């Protein structure tokens, strides 16, 4: 008789995805199963799906010859002395070896190998971390704690609830990750979820998972993510295997646990983390977050510890939090953040920890200002990219600006990639992947890229427009100077944006004078003008031609649906078509003018005939290999060095 089985009980096999594909449009995995019959059984007015496994017959005993051959192969393997791995039982103080086949010298070999690849972690010693955690930090290359980690870990180890203000890229994931993983190490045999981390985006959730996997002190600690991109059924199965840490987005987590009554899995959690809390307060997340907080219940029953992190907090709220929330939060303060803090229900009075109290922007970010007319912003942008090449993120306020700036830079042979809300997931991932892999790439984006995306080694952030809010300026600038690196944030401001800049400075508690006026070489700007004018003409004609093409395609599709013959097919000499062909000829002509200019190196400060004459001794620079990549006659200096010199 075939055996009935639930969908979650079937033995699913993971399908290995091809390596040659660049991305999977946000698709995270695929599983398959064989030998299962699907039948439909009437159940009232509906039909119930039944999964049946075929009857399993016992296999006949192997032939004597085959059995002897297998025994011979097994004995040969035994003679070779293949070492078996020891079984390790984790305890709160360290590792206890329980295997009979354990070789004590193998530990020394592993230790030597570990030390040869790890870094010195003596700077972490005063945190009283377990040897396993110190070993993981050493192997991962974290030689010393960052400021937010130094503030959070001691307080979290005692058991305090934490409200942390930390810049993006400041190391806050490890600040809450280390205490959580230490707790999981002490309770590695627990059969329920120990910690829940809630993040606003799928990308951020997977980054947090990667960090946890990187530093987890024991392979027995299981970390799983619940986000879009994986089948709900698979996530439910994984959740039933009792992972220690769950990292999730609010919407998907709510749908997974609510549909199959898995809310009980989270009622005993010991740690709750709300990362990038300001973004979790958006309408798209807040409803599900409120429901999740209601399910978690009263922390007094489970002694649950709570961590809330954000890069920005309202000034008045900060003052009240610094007073340990004296008198609690009342109805007269009704900001979204405070309403959420009321819903969270802390175990005790939370500690407010600010890693950068002096400034909202990370201390390693140097901020520059370029004042220019709106019509000249493209010219100044091209100048910055040519003069200071490096991985650059350009933030604009509108999607139409992204659609114009990206092809403009591409016409100038600058590798540029768009990122905005109207792009589908596949194209977003393609742009991000190309940008990450190009050390001189430019990501032209709206504020969707300001949070939740960890892109290493971003050298410059350029604000093409003054951002609408101070919070967004902080998040944009936080894309650079991540993980103890230095970075540059340059704000381009037009005359009409001056009042907006003043409001921004007021919110950030700084004067406009604190922005360093970024120097611009006007002689190079004049040389680049011709290129920029030609590129503008090409882009304008291309976009105009594209609009005409889209209109024609729409009219044709409408005519086909109505069963009417298209008038375009009858008359090939329509004005639109002749205009389109004229535009194409103009574009080809303009590109032929631009090509030799782009091929030619920019020269400044010296004579082409006499290398030692003029303001720059070019012969000496060539001999000393002090030549700029794009501009002959200029020193190869970074934008960071320029701002550092002007700051002194």
From Swiss-Prot:
Gene: mak5
KW Phosphoprotein (keyword) present: yes
Motif position, DEAD box: 275-278
Annotated EC: 3.6.4.13
Name of the protein: ATP-dependent RNA helicase mak5
Pfam families membership: DEAD, Helicase_C
Residue numbers of Phosphoserine PTMs: 85, 566-567
Catalytic activity: ATP + H2O = ADP + phosphate + H(+)
Keywords assigned: ATP-binding, Helicase, Hydrolase, Nucleotide-binding, Nucleus, Phosphoprotein, Ribosome biogenesis, RNA-binding, rRNA processing
Domain Helicase ATP-binding stretches: 153-331
Domain Helicase C-terminal positions: 378-523
GO cellular component: nucleolus; nucleus
Ranges annotated as biased composition (Basic and acidic residues): 52-76, 573-582
Binding-site list for ATP: 166-173
Function: ATP-binding RNA helicase involved in the biogenesis of 60S ribosomal subunits and is required for the normal formation of 25S and 5.8S rRNAs.
Keyword Transcription: no
Species of the source: Schizosaccharomyces pombe (strain 972 / ATCC 24843) (Fission yeast)
GO BP annotations listed: ribosome biogenesis; rRNA processing
Record comment regarding domains: The Q motif is unique to and characteristic of the DEAD box family of RNA helicases and controls ATP binding and hydrolysis.
Taxonomy of the source species: Eukaryota, Fungi, Dikarya, Ascomycota, Taphrinomycotina
Cellular location(s): Nucleus, Nucleolus
Region of interest (Disordered), residue spans: 52-89, 561-586
Major enzyme class: hydrolase
């Amino acid at each position: 008789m075939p055996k009935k089985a639930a969908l979650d009980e079937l033995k699913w096999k993971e399908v290995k995805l091809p390596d040659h594909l660049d991305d999977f449009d946000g698709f995270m995995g695929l599983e398959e199963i064989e030998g299962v019959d699907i039948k439909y059984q009437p159940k009232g007015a509906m039909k119930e799906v039944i999964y049946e496994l075929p009857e399993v017959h016992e296999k006949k005993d192997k032939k004597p010859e085959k059995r002897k051959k297998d025994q011979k192969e097994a004995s040969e393997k035994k003679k070779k002395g293949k070492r078996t791995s020891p079984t390790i039982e984790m305890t709160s103080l360290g590792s206890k070896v329980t295997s009979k086949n354990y070789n004590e010298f193998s530990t020394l070999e592993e230790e030597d190998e570990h030390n040869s690849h790890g870094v010195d972690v003596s700077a972490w010693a005063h945190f009283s971390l377990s040897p396993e955690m110190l070993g993981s930090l050493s192997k991962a290359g974290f030689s010393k704690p960052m400021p937010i980690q130094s503030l959070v870990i001691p307080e979290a180890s005692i058991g305090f609830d934490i409200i942390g203000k930390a810049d993006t890229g400041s190391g806050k994931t490890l600040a809450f990750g280390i205490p959580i993983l230490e707790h999981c190490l002490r309770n590695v045999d627990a059969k329920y979820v120990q910690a829940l981390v809630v993040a606003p985006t799928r990308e951020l959730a997977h980054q947090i998972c990667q960090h946890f996997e990187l530093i987890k002190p024991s392979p027995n600690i299981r970390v799983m993510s619940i986000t879009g991109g994986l089948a709900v059924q698979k996530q439910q199965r994984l959740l039933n295997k009792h992972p220690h840490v769950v990292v999730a987005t609010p919407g998907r987590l709510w749908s997974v646990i609510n549909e199959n009554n898995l809310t009980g899995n989270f009622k005993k959690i010991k740690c709750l983390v709300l990362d990038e809390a300001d973004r979790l307060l958006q309408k798209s997340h807040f409803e599900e977050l409120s429901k999740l907080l209601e399910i978690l219940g009263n922390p007094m029953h489970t002694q649950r510890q709570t961590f809330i992190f954000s890069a920005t907090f309202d000034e008045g709220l900060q003052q009240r939090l610094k007073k340990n929330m004296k008198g609690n939060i009342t109805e007269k303060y009704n900001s979204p953040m405070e309403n959420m803090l009321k819903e969270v229900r802390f175990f005790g009075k939370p500690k407010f920890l600010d890693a950068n109290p002096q400034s909202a922007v990370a201390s390693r970010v140097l901020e520059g200002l370029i004042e220019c007319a709106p019509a000249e912003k493209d010219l100044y942008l091209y100048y910055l990219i040519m003069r200071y090449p490096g991985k650059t993120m350009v933030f604009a306020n509108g999607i139409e600006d992204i659609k114009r700036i990206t092809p403009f830079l591409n016409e100038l042979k600058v590798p540029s990639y768009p990122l905005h809300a109207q792009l589908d997931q596949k194209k977003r991932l393609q742009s991000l992947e190309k940008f990450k892999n190009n050390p001189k790439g430019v990501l032209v984006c709206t504020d969707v890229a300001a949070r939740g995306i960890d892109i290493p080694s971003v050298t410059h952030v350029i604000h093409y427009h003054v951002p609408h809010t101070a919070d967004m300026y902080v998040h944009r600038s936080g894309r650079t100077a991540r993980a103890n690196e230095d970075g540059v944030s340059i704000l381009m401001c037009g005359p009409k944006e001056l009042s907006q800049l003043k409001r921004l400075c007021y919110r950030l508690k700084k004067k406009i004078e604190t922005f360093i006026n970024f120097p611009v070489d006007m002689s190079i700007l004049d040389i680049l003008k011709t290129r920029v004018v030609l590129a503008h003409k090409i882009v304008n004609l291309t976009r105009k031609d594209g609009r005409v093409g889209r209109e024609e395609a729409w009219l044709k599709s409408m005519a086909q649906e109505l069963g009417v013959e298209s008038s375009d097919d009858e008359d090939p000499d329509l004005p639109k078509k002749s205009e389109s062909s004229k535009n194409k000829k103009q574009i080809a002509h303009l590109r032929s003018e631009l090509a030799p200019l782009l091929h030619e190196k920019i020269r400044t400060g010296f004579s082409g005939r006499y290398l030692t004459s003029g303001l720059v001794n070019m012969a000496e620079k060539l001999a000393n290999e002090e030549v700029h990549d794009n501009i002959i006659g200029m020193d190869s200096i970074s934008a960071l060095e320029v701002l550092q010199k002007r700051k002194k």
